[in-house]
Design a protein with these regions (language model features):
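Histidine-centered metal-chelating micro-motifs
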Residues: 38-39, 77-90, 166-168, 211-213
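Glycine- and acidic-residue-biased ligand/ion/polar-headgroup-sensing regions
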Residues: 43-63, 164, 175-213
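Ligand-binding loop in jelly-roll beta-barrel domains
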Residues: 71-110
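A short glycine-rich, His/Asp/Glu-containing loop-to-beta-strand
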Residues: 7-38, 134-181
Length: 213
């Protein structure tokens, strides 16, 4: 976790950097943009650009699409997933926009893809409901893993936590976790895949109030 008194600044704000620690296998940061800003990337890594809020035009591989996300708490994710050495341009169309950027070393090639709610491995799944007096109720949105993109080195998504609730599994014995289904989503396996050295990123956010939508 990175703590700051002044908040994120306009431009790219690095939070973690691949290689800073022996088990840090990815870069992660937040890009803050203002209307008219244009930012270009061509990274030697697999990259995922997640629109957190705002209206942005993505340009990549001779394609272009303008997308908008008004609330990361109430709306499905929108993200651009590209392999290494893919030129990407982002243009801010709203007064402000925020984009979460994840990168990891991966030489494998795959087709770049702009993903929306219907493209996700499992979107807006309510987990923990009805258990422990709702102490672990949360919304889990799984973008992708190797079941829907075999070439990726990411297992990535968003977790929206309610105020005062656990943002993941509450403390339980590891032995119990081995026999616990991690998802009720029909698209996902009922056990965590065992990969050799995956890069894992879950963006955890807490809304100001219980969602009504």
């Amino acid at each position: 976790m990175k703590l700051t008194n002044s908040g994120f600044q306009r431009g790219y704000n690095p939070i973690v950097v691949e290689g800073d620690a022996s088990d840090m296998n990815m870069d992660f940061g937040e890009l803050l943009m203002e209307k008219g800003d244009t930012v270009s990337y061509n990274e030697p890594k697999e990259c995922i650009y997640v629109l957190v809020t705002g209206k942005v035009t993505f340009r990549w591989a001779d394609k272009e699409e303008t997308v908008e996300r008004k609330s990361c708490f109430h709306e499905d994710p929108i993200l651009l997933h590209v392999p290494q050495n893919t030129a990407v341009e982002l243009m801010c169309q709203s007064d402000k926009a925020e984009v979460s950027i994840q990168r990891t070393t991966n030489p494998k090639h795959f087709e770049p893809k702009l993903m929306k709610g219907e493209d996700l491995l499992c979107g807006s799944e309510l987990r923990g409901a009805g258990l422990m007096n709702e102490a672990s109720t949360r919304i889990v949105r799984t973008f992708l893993d190797r079941s829907n993109c075999p070439e990726t080195n990411f297992f990535i998504g968003e977790v929206v936590s309610y105020p005062g609730k656990w943002s993941s599994f509450p403390p339980i014995p590891t032995r119990s976790l081995r026999s616990t289904s991690i998802s009720s989503c029909p698209k996902m396996a009922t056990a965590m895949p065992r990969w050799e050295t995956p890069s894992i990123k879950f963006t955890t956010t807490t809304p100001p109030a219980w969602p009504t939508a």
